[in-house]
């Protein structure tokens, strides 16, 4: 399925995200929460990045996993989770995707209000949304 990331008007900054990887250990997950300092610290900051074992070499060659270890990442191999002390949250995968959205949208450079609805998001779609918000709001003219 395709990636979709949109922003709708809202009084608060909220992210609603669905991920689905088609693998049993990484089944469909959904999370919706207001993004505040408190929710960031309690619900998102501890969510680690993740990848299938088969992609590790490719990521290393591309220089994308510098400093990566089982202390700060989750690896999926043959339907099993490989991570120090297991998952931190039952839905750690979607939490990490929401964490990515927060980080990528910080490129807007302003405090956001609005509901982000994300389906299978990734860095390219998140950054494209950040750029579009800057364009529409006139922040690129400053």
For each of these PLM feature ranges, what is it?
Residues 1-142:
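Short acidic-hydrophobic catalytic motif
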């Amino acid at each position: 399925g395709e990636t979709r990331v949109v922003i709708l008007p809202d009084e608060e900054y909220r992210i609603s995200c669905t991920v689905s990887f088609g693998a049993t250990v990484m089944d469909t997950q959904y999370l919706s929460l207001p993004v505040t300092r408190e929710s960031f610290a309690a619900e998102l900051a501890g969510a680690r990045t993740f990848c299938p074992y088969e992609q590790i070499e490719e990521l290393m060659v591309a220089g994308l996993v510098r400093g990566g270890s089982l202390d700060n990442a989750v690896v999926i191999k043959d339907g099993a989770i490989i991570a120090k002390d297991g998952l931190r949250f039952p839905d750690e995968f979607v939490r990490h995707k929401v964490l990515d959205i927060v980080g990528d949208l910080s490129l807007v450079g302003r405090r956001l209000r609005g509901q982000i609805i994300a389906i299978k998001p990734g860095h390219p779609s998140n950054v494209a949304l950040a750029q579009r918000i800057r364009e529409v709001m006139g922040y690129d003219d400053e």
